[in-house]
Amino acid sequence: MAEKTADETKSNSAGETKSNGSVPRVVLVTGASRFLGGYLVRRLAQNPDIERVIAVDSVSPSKDMLRRMGRAEFVRADIRNPLIGKVVRGAEVDTVVHASTLQRAPKSGSRAAMKDMNVIGAMQLFAVCQKAPTVRKVVLRSASVVYGCSAKDPVKFTEEMSARRRPPGGYARDSLEIEGYLRGMGRRRPDISVGILRLAPLIGPQLTATVGHYVSAPVVPTIVGRDARLQLLHVEDALAALECATVSSVAGTYNIAADGVVMMSQAIRRAGRIQVPMPLALFRSAGSALVGSSMRLYTDEQLEYFRFGCGLDTTRMRTEMGFSPRWTTMQALDDFVRATQTRRIIGSSWIDRAEQTLTAIVGGNAVSSPGSQNADVLSMPDTGSGVVER
């Protein structure tokens, strides 16, 4: 893979797709040093119908990621800098995939710095696309976070719906602004095809994302009286959806999510962890005592997702975009648990037997299973921590 400066630059998909035969010639992908952007560059570079793939980011990817990108060209450039225009015009880019939106403020920065990188960067990039005569398509990686999370949410959000209340997090507000600026560019340049993909929370064996990290804690704090509905998206399906939007002629806004939902309690149980319900007022403080400093890393919008969850209507994704995810939500979760080889604190078979026993007791028929109480309760070695095998 060749790494270039701005001055030097003049599918076997996981999901099933219906290609419309509109393969681009030169594709530029932002956010290439991150997981999703980097692996998308890799997939596009493997497409022989695409002449050039240009990966852009303000920091260089790891050596391993550079190697994975193959024939793609890396350009170290900040999309807030006017030099990005020189890259687009010099390479005669016809398709731009914007996948560099930050979900949290950088370690050395503030919320203002995050907004500057997200919103101002997107405005600058879209302005360049609007002025470039060769650009014919812009694809935005957005997120379902734009719908927010609340007790008043519908069972499933369609693309026409909006949040029931203003999202509390900066990532959601930035995503809404970025979507608005992209639609505005599309109105001013109707010859440019605009695609917005609102991805459900990602999970996968190669990615330490929010939900996977949360349910991997030995003890998982939850809120009394709440059991969030989780609709996830396997990272391979996310990459396949972005590739589909890039190489086909589809345009518009699409919810991208796997089939089905998993309740938070069910996800914790399938991961073999222990759920500890607590009042909302103690959720962050008591949660920090249980899981340590990692609790403080979650944003307000992520904590609200753990409380309420969010369901997405994917009818348009299937009928208009022609994309069908390979993994269901349950399968994506199980793939993460299996691949990360998480040590189970409570065996799932023991939980199944306990549920059957309780059901029988409630029904008036106590079930006795000699010799089963001590089987498969703990797959962790006994460390004398006081955990009883029951």
Language model region names:
Residues 152-153, 184-231, 235:
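NAD(P)-dependent short-chain dehydrogenase/reductase
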Residues 73-120, 149:
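NAD(P)H-binding glycine-rich loop region in Rossmannoid oxidoreductase-like domains
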Residues 113-124, 173-174, 233:
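Glycine-rich NAD(P)-binding loop of the Rossmann-fold in SDR/ketoreductase-type enzymes
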Residues 166-195:
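Active-site Tyr-X1-5-Lys
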Residues 176, 190-192, 203-213, 244-255, ...:
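Glycine/proline-rich active-site loop of Rossmann-fold NAD(P)-dependent oxidoreductases
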Residues 123-170:
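Conserved Rossmann-fold NAD(P)-dependent oxidoreductase catalytic core, especially the SDR/UDP-sugar
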Residues 26-47:
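N-terminal Rossmann NAD(P)H-binding glycine-rich loop of SDR-like oxidoreductase domains
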Residues 239-301, 314, 334, 343, ...:
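Mid/C-terminal beta-alpha module of Rossmann-like enzyme folds, strongest
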